[in-house]
Structure formats: structure tokens, C-alpha cells
């Protein structure tokens, strides 16, 4: 079983407009509301793929109830209730662009943070892999993911971390390391304080930096150009085919789902990387975020090319 952690979930609201007009009224006909947050996207893709998945995080108010009520029944909801209201994130789709308005979310008390920590420990009993995705809610210290990873490690669980900024830096500088991190080039550049490109020699050099010591897998997303990955002392370039992209939103989360599934099933390097990239591409071919059409899985699987570099 795979446990997904979304500490700062949201209701994602989508407003499609032919044109966004500023300083006036914009009327929307087709409004879409879905449970949002990176970890919930991971949950839905794992569910589509047929994995047994348990979802947790901090939710509150009517928005929190909406999330529980609108997840597929086959996803085991094990959320922790807090006093604050779960946030709303708005995406305005206009003229081929996407403008986002993101609420910060609720402020958690010390007691609520401690309560979730105990809740997390309890949930580990029957899981093999834990995914930790997205931003931390207000009130949680930057090193909170580090704390959860330490607990998971003590219980022999594999962890996949997908976050950025101070939370990621705190994990890299801490003692407890995740099994996998999945930065993109922009996040990698931010971590290292220099601009990174798709130069494989440069990537090989920086991924051997002491900053990444103790992390078994580093999987760097190159967007439409695939992935550059390091597993222990082996480096891989994953080349993906060109596809028609409907929406790339959530494709990184779908890739995390594939990584987690690969770990849970003890797959070899090539199988794990192939599965992860296929799920990312399948999501990009869908209008709905965090959804994959498995009818196209086998064809895309055969089109992935992986080589050691």
C-alpha cells in the first residue's frame, strides 16, 4: 500500500474564459471544482493505475469535507481534521494562458501539528511507500518533512519527496534522507545557486554534490525532454516521445505516482523510470488533472528510451 501526504490541500477551482478582462466583470459558465493539492493528484493517478492508496493530510471546514466527499471511494481517506478552513486555489484559463490565484491556507497550532505527527505514525503500519508532496501549511516549521521522513525511515518505509524551497533545503541539510527526490531544473538551480541546463555532464557533476548524499534516487524532470536520473552511482537519460499535450498540470505528480508504484513493487531501474514517465505523459493528454487513461499505457511504455550516461 502507498500512503500519500498532502499537508496543505485545496479545492481547485477552474474558470475557463475566452478572454480575461481586467477591471470589469468576467462571467464564467463552465466552473470545475476538484480536490486539489499535489499529493491528491498522486492519489488519483495511483488509484487509476490500480494501486491501493491511502491519502492523508490536514483538512478543515466545509472545504475539507468537500475534499473527502469528492475523492474516489476506492481511495482510503485518512485525513486529520484541523480547526481552520482548507484553502481554495483558482485557475483562470484564458487565451492559452493560465493565471493562478492561490490562497495560503490555514494556520496550524502546535497541538494540531503534534496531533498530525501521531496520526502519521499510526498510518504507517500497513504501507510500503510514503509520498510527501507540496507546500507546508502556515505554522509548520520548514523541517517538518524532515521529521516525517525520519519517522518513516525508522519504520522501514520508502519515501518520495516532491517539494521545493525552504522545505526541500531543510531535508537536504538534515540527517534523515528520503529515498527519492524529484526536482525540476528550476528547483535544482535554486538549490545550487546557479542556473542548470540539460547538459548531462554538468548534471552528473552536480548530482554528486555532498548536498545529495544519502539520497538513493534523484530524478530531475526535463519537461518535454524527459528525465535525467541518478540511482546510487548510475546515471540515466530517459527520452520520451513527442505527444499532443492537453494540459501539463499535474504531470509531475503523476510521475511521482509512477515512482511510488515502482518502489512499492520492487521494480528495477528501467521499469521504474519507464512507468513514471508514461504516467506523466498520460496525465498531460487529459483535461482533468491527476487522471490517466490506461488504454494508452502500453503503447507509450514501448516508446520510452532509456540509456546509461
Swiss-Prot record:
GO terms for cellular component: cytosol. Pathway: Carbohydrate metabolism; D-tagatose 6-phosphate degradation; D-glyceraldehyde 3-phosphate and glycerone phosphate from D-tagatose 6-phosphate: step 1/2. GO terms for biological process: D-tagatose 6-phosphate catabolic process; lactose catabolic process via tagatose-6-phosphate. It catalyses: D-tagatofuranose 6-phosphate + ATP = D-tagatofuranose 1,6-bisphosphate + ADP + H(+). Keywords: ATP-binding, Kinase, Lactose metabolism, Nucleotide-binding, Transferase. Gene3D superfamilies: 3.40.1190.20. GO terms for molecular function: ATP binding; phosphofructokinase activity; tagatose-6-phosphate kinase activity. HAMAP family: LacC (MF_01557). This is Tagatose-6-phosphate kinase. It comes from Streptococcus pyogenes serotype M49 (strain NZ131).
